[in-house]
Curated annotation (Swiss-Prot):
Induction: Up-regulated by osmotic stress, sugar deprivation, high salinity, and hypoxia. Up-regulated by abscisic acid treatment and drought stress. No effect of thiamine, salicylic acid or paraquat treatments. Down-regulated by dark incubation. Substrate binds at A94, E114, Q115, G122, A187, D218, H233, M285, R295, M296, G297. It catalyses: [ADP-thiazole synthase]-L-cysteine + glycine + NAD(+) = [ADP-thiazole synthase]-dehydroalanine + ADP-5-ethyl-4-methylthiazole-2-carboxylate + nicotinamide + 3 H2O + 2 H(+). It holds the Pfam family Thi4. Keywords: Cell membrane, Chloroplast, Iron, Membrane, Metal-binding, Mitochondrion, NAD, Plastid, Thiamine biosynthesis, Transferase, Transit peptide. This is Thiamine thiazole synthase, chloroplastic. Signal peptide: none annotated. The modification 2,3-didehydroalanine (Cys) is found at C216.
Length: 349
């Protein structure tokens, strides 16, 4: 299992202040940036389909069979995941990365809840609806792990379209037998027993968005040993995990993210990813909301590595081998540096 790429080392770094930056004031060159694209050669081989496209017909099927197959399989999944190991709330870049990391252990059952029909969050595009995805080094090592190509620059890499990352990690993740994505499903609330988060309250997303117009639409539940909240920054449906913790008195305040500072923000997001209350780990831009870290803008490395760290923290909380406390056994990539979680730097919310 690969360790986590980040800008911090677990064993050899001195403690940093809350929002220390890794940027050292290097001058920005006025010269045009070389795109540096390498020429690629493609070979196209003609293949013959195993059917006649001019006289194609499908095998017959009864409409009721289609209905039964969809219903039976979905209901089986709902029964199976009514009590699970980990629930990841939010399938953006951080949530998908967390689920990917956790599910490397085939014995851990992972449910992903995403209120949108289309998972991926903001990772289908770069900034301002542009296509390219910018990832600062050394987070590109995660792209190497999942097999996403990029154009390499000195301190960062560029994926030609953000959708390449999202579609790749999603296809790898959903192919794993211990993962189930429940999209178009909203997490309306948390299950809390004593002082520990023990799962989420769920409903169809369209129902959750229309409680003001309809009545008698009670929810469902999904119990979990660990909840990973990756609900993004504040907005109509953002940062819902930490906002709910505040409203029920489990944390004191949610100051909200500060103005944009990429060099400070990305290090802080990874460093401050943690289990904020027993049973609930916060990752991605939701970390900025609870800690008042700066927003990072259209760079995605911290989302990936924060998600990886959250995944390893979840494994640790489950008492399983993980990269946080060094109990991971296997073929670790020596060039990957673990994102340290210095308890002295944990901020009281």
């Amino acid at each position: 299992m690969a360790a986590i790429a980040s800008t911090l080392s677990l064993s050899s770094t001195k403690p940093q202040r809350l929002f220390d930056s890794s940027f050292h004031g290097s001058a920005i060159s006025a010269a045009p940036i070389s795109i540096g694209l390498k020429p690629r050669s493609f070979s196209v081989r003609a293949t013959t389909a195993g059917y006649d496209l001019n006289a194609f017909t499908f095998d017959p099927i009864k409409e009721s069979i289609v209905s039964r197959e969809m219903t039976r399989r979905y209901m089986t999944d709902m029964i199976t995941y009514a009590e699970t190991d980990v629930v990841v709330v939010g399938a953006g870049s951080a949530g998908l990365s967390a689920a990917y990391e956790i599910s490397k252990n085939p014995n851990v059952q992972v449910a992903i809840i995403e209120q949108s029909v289309s998972p991926g969050g903001g990772a289908w595009l770069g900034g301002q609806l542009f296509s390219a995805m910018i990832v600062r080094k050394p987070a590109h090592l995660f792209l190497d792990e999942i097999g996403v190509a990029y154009d390499e620059q000195d301190t960062y890499v560029v994926v030609k379209h953000a959708a390449l990352f999202t579609s790749t990690i999603m296809s790898k993740l959903l192919a794993r037998p211990n993962v189930k994505l429940f999209n178009a499903v909203a997490a309306e609330d948390l299950i809390v027993k004593g002082n520990r988060v023990g799962g989420v309250v769920t409903n169809w997303a369209l129902v959750a968005q229309n409680h003001h117009t309809q009545s008698c639409m009670d929810p469902n539940v999904m119990e979990a040993k660990i909840v990973v909240s990756s609900c993004g920054h504040d907005g109509p449906f953002g940062a819902t995990g930490v906002k709910r913790l505040k409203s029920i008195g489990m944390i004191d305040h949610v100051p909200g993210m500060k103005a944009l500072d990429m060099n400070t923000a990305e290090d802080a997001i990874v460093r401050l990813t943690r289990e904020v209350v027993p049973g609930m780990i916060v990752t991605g831009m939701e970390v900025a909301e609870i800690d008042g870290a700066p927003r990072m803008g259209p760079t995605f490395g911290a989302m990936m590595i924060s998600g990886q760290k959250a995944g390893q923290l979840a494994l640790k909380a489950l008492g399983l081998p993980n990269a946080i406390d060094g109990t991971l056994v296997g073929n670790l990539s020596p060039e990957l540096v673990l994102a340290a979680a210095d308890s002295a730097e944990t901020v009281d919310a």
